[in-house]
Swiss-Prot record:
The record marks T100 as: Interaction with substrate tRNA. Catalyzes the transfer of a dimethylallyl group onto the adenine at position 37 in tRNAs that read codons beginning with uridine, leading to the formation of N6-(dimethylallyl)adenosine (i(6)A). Its EC number is 2.5.1.75. It catalyses: adenosine(37) in tRNA + dimethylallyl diphosphate = N(6)-dimethylallyladenosine(37) in tRNA + diphosphate. Keywords: ATP-binding, Magnesium, Nucleotide-binding, Transferase, tRNA processing. This is tRNA dimethylallyltransferase. ATP binds at G12, T13, T14, A15, S16, G17, K18, S19. Residues 37-40 are annotated as: Interaction with substrate tRNA. The gene is miaA. Its cofactor is Mg(2+). Belongs to the IPP transferase family.
Length: 303
């Protein structure tokens, strides 16, 4: 019987080097990359989401990136469906790469996601209340779900509230797990906060220099200031600058602070999973070490 190609997960905090490791590993293993980032799925959000470049995507096939419009409501269930279909149809090693823990769990653990259609009117009413209020509200009606959602994640927060008010039951109580049968290896890239900080600073300044302000300005002009994605990390701060509330320097520093806080929450999330094999992102011969682990874990010689 032919061996089933494994699903190789590369996760970790923002700015830890996941994308570069994935690109190098994919070329070595003749693999493809599936994105696991809740914002990189959207077209036109390129710089602020650190989306793989067109050159990278030409070097290695990437999927689940640029698959919907900024105004679309893309649910976790839809992400899971598309990812599972790709995994079933691609007959080669696959790297699932990103920092959105819920996306990764949806695939690795086979989360059973409630089949509740979007409630447009309810969602609009909730959105008008503002994310801080909605996030606090979620902590009251479904603290389990709230503990798994980032404070700035407008889409996931609204979805959890939407399910609660549509069904009368917390989304967490409607969820279960149905793990896939194919082999899975999870790789985590870790860095101590003092090592990650310079990377965050460098990347933030690089984003601004690459045209983040123009990107946000274009989104506002095209979709208006109330676009939910403009409330997310990197975009919210630049929007404040464009509205004259803060200077560009203040916006940049604010992004750095918020990114550092986001990375701390990501670290806490991923460290809870004992199945992840952790590597120091700065270690010498990182690619060789990861390649060796992957091959041993799924039976050496598979590739």
């Amino acid at each position: 019987m032919a061996k089933v190609p494994p699903l190789i997960v590369i996760c970790g905090t923002t700015a830890s080097g996941k994308s570069q490791l994935a690109l190098d590993l994919a070329q070595r293993l003749n693999a493809v990359i599936l994105g696991a980032d809740s914002r990189q799925i959207y077209k036109e959000l390129d710089i602020g989401t650190a989306k793989p470049t067109l050159g990278d995507r030409q070097t290695v096939p990437h999927y689940l990136i640029d698959i919907c419009e900024p105004t679309e409501n893309f649910t976790l269930a839809e992400y899971q469906r598309q990812a599972q279909e790709l995994i079933a149809s691609l007959n080669q090693p696959i790297l699932l790469v990103g920092g959105t823990g819920l996306y990764i769990q949806a695939i690795v653990k086979g989360l059973k996601i409630p089949a509740v259609p979007p409630q447009t009117n309810l969602r609009e009413q909730l959105a008008n209340l503002g994310q801080p209020f909605c996030y606090q509200l979620l902590s009251q009606v479904d603290p389990v779900a709230q503990s798994k959602i980032e404070p700035a994640d407008v889409v996931r927060t609204l979805r959890a509230l939407e399910v609660f008010y549509a069904t009368g039951r917390p989304i967490s109580s409607l969820q279960g797990e149905n793990p896939p049968s194919y082999p899975i290896v999870q790789i985590g890239l870790g860095l101590e906060p003092e090592q990650l900080q310079p990377r965050i600073v460098h990347r933030t300044h690089a984003m601004v220099e690459a045209g983040l302000v123009k990107e946000v300005e274009g989104l506002i002009n095209q979709y208006g200031e109330d676009l939910p994605l403009l409330h997310t990390l990197g975009y919210a701060e630049i929007k404040q600058y464009l509205q004259g509330q803060i200077s560009l320097t203040q916006a940049t520093e604010s992004i750095i602070v918020h990114t550092r806080q986001f990375a701390k929450r990501q670290r806490t999330w991923f460290r809870k999973d004992s199945a992840i094999h952790w590597f120091d992102a700065n270690q010498p011969n990182l690619l060789d070490s990861v390649t060796k682990l992957v091959q041993v874990d799924v039976n050496e010689g598979m590739f």
